[in-house]
Amino acid sequence: MIFATGVGGFETLADQVTVYNERGARRVSPFLVPMMMANAGAAHVSMRNGWRGPSETVVTACAAGTHAVANAARLVATGRCDVVVGGGAEASMHPVAIAAFANMTAMSTSGISRPFDMRRDGFVISEGAAALVLEAWDHAVARGARIYAEIAGSGSTADAYHITAPAPDGEGAVACMEQALLDAGLSAADIAHINAHGTSTPLNDLAEARAINKVFGEPGPPVTSTKGVTGHGLGAAGAIEAVASVMAIDRRLIPPTYGCEQLDPEVHLDVVRAEARPWEPGPVLSNSFGFGGHNGCLVLLPPAD
């Protein structure tokens, strides 16, 4: 069980601070510590199901979900485990968290998520969870499981630049995408679709677009950001978008980037807009770039015949 979160039990912590201030130390819940710890998600799922293999939590901001899925896949690929559940969860829509993001000027003031649109003004915070059951091919076939996709490779790098802003040259993101391609044994020309991080912030979308162009040229493969629909699930986002990538393969449709109506003229990408685009499924790259310069990428393939 490898699970991700960005802020853990923030709501519990914030609520108990209010209890402390209003009612005193003796009224603070004894469950505060185990409920606020970031590892609680993986711990509770493993306890509920009696899973005694690896049970770990990844906390790398907005890249955490992608890193968790990648780490889970690695445990299977190396033969350490036959089956690993990888994913992420986030529930941080507390007034204090929202105020903090708003005061950072990271959140949208319009309340609309518009990835790559010229009118974008920040991300729209959301809550959610997603998980993938990852297992060795032979193990899945033996139990008659439906195989939706394969994880072929992953990348993980750091910008080493700023606690919140992406590196403007995009070199950390470029290195991460190239690392994922190398791990998958593919070239840039092999990628048929990119699920972008695409948060709808002015800085992130432009930095990611430039990084994609450096790796894939202009305009590159069809790009979508599902955050136009889901908002930004922070530590869960990468897992949610991995599932979206799998569904794009399964449904043979690239989802449109909701909210992107007027493409930013500085974004030189083939952004899928307005309606879903039918495609012949091929390798998909899913990007996640988080606060602190954490970068994560996954390469997913249609299942072999």
Where are these regions (language model features)?
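Conserved beta-ketoacyl condensing-enzyme motif
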Residues: 1-60, 89-97, 188-204
